[in-house]
A protein has these predicted regions:
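Class I S-adenosyl-L-methionine
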Residues: 1-24, 29-123, 223-224, 229, ...
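A contiguous loop/helix-start segment that scaffolds small-molecule binding in enzyme catalytic cores
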Residues: 2-14, 88-92, 148, 156-272
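Class I SAM-dependent methyltransferase SAM-binding "motif I" and its flanking Rossmann-like core
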Residues: 3, 12, 23, 99-171, ...
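Short hydrophobic alpha-helical segments that form membrane-spanning helices or hydrophobic packing faces
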Residues: 27-29, 131-134, 187-188
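Residues at the C-termini of beta-strands that transition into short coil/loop
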Residues: 45, 65, 124-126, 155, ...
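Alpha-helix capping/helix-boundary segments
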Residues: 47-48, 101, 128, 183, ...
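Phosphate- and divalent-cation-binding pockets in alpha/beta enzyme and binding domains
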Residues: 50-51, 104, 130-131, 186-187
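Short hydrophobic/aromatic-enriched beta-strand-loop microsegments
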Residues: 59-66, 119-121, 140-150, 195-204
Length: 272
């Protein structure tokens, strides 16, 4: 990376950096520059190994990640560590998978810094929904199809039942569900309850952008079984299927697209 532009140093105590979904190719130049200037990097578990490999050897690395439905660092511990490290005068990078402002509990960490009168800046990253859609050759919005995009999380069930399920169930709507594997059957039931058809298009993308990325083309009818077969972090795109005509998905080899067993209408009849 010797041809990269020079990066100006910054006086802020903490830089929040979105690392993208996994591949180092999706890291922004600003994010790369922040990593090179850091004294301490506090990172999540969802940060890809390719990105972690870009952290200089002399930089102190602290793993304080969260794992869905598994062992996780307490948010209070993360906040306290941020404040403690930044208070020493070290240049701290808080490295989060995807975009740090989407389901990353960014505000809680900022509030902890503000309470300690510590400065910060935010460097956004590519979020999984954007990269996943690109990897299946689709756009998240399309003129004449959907005038809005919903981004929801299936991890915290508090308030999840109160989502706009009727709106999501409408033909042509697109919703990106983060951390939705374990709530797949609930999602299916709610959408069908509000009028979504069993053959509604669904794509599940596991380990987005990584070497072991897996794309599963499904329907609403097969969503729970498709989700149950995945073992890694995944995003669910409701209302979209992989675009295959003319090899539009340049990155995807045929072996990496799987079709979930159909229990309703054939895949080619699914609504996109």
């Amino acid at each position: 990376m010797s041809n990269l532009p020079a990066f100006a140093s910054t006086a802020v105590a903490v830089t929040f950096v979105g690392a993208g979904p996994g591949a180092a190719a999706h890291l922004t130049l600003a994010a790369y520059g922040a990593l090179q200037q850091a004294d301490v990097v506090i990172h999540d578990r969802l940060v890809g190994p390719e990105v972690l490999a870009l952290i200089p050897a002399h930089v102190v690395r602290i793993d304080l990640g969260k794992q869905g439905f598994g062992p996780s660092a307490l948010q209070t511990t993360i906040n306290a560590t941020l404040v403690a490290q930044a208070s020493t005068g070290a240049r701290v990078v808080r490295l989060k998978g995807g975009d740090c402002g989407i389901f990353g509990r960014l505000d809680e960490e900022i509030e902890a810094l503000e309470a300690a009168q510590l400065s910060f800046r935010i460097l956004p990253g590519l979020t999984s929904a954007a990269v996943a859609a690109a990897n299946i050759g689709q756009s998240l919005t399309r003129r004449g199809r959907n005038a809005a995009l919903r981004i929801v999380t299936g991890h915290d069930m508090v308030g999840f039942a109160d989502q706009d399920w009727r709106g999501m169930a409408q033909p042509g709507e697109v919703t990106a569900v983060y951390m939705g594997k374990k709530s797949a059957r609930f999602i299916q039931g709610r959408l069908m309850m509000h009028g979504a058809l069993p053959d509604t298009a669904v794509t599940l993308i596991e380990n987005v952008s990584r070497a072991d990325e897996r794309i599963v083309a499904a329907t609403l009818a097969t969503l729970p079984d498709a989700a149950a077969a995945l073992t890694g972090p995944a995003i669910i795109l409701l209302g979209l299927l992989p675009r295959r005509a003319g090899h539009a998905v340049a990155k995807i080899k045929a072996t990496r697209i799987q079709e979930a067993p159909l229990q309703a209408a054939p895949l080619q009849e699914a609504r996109t």
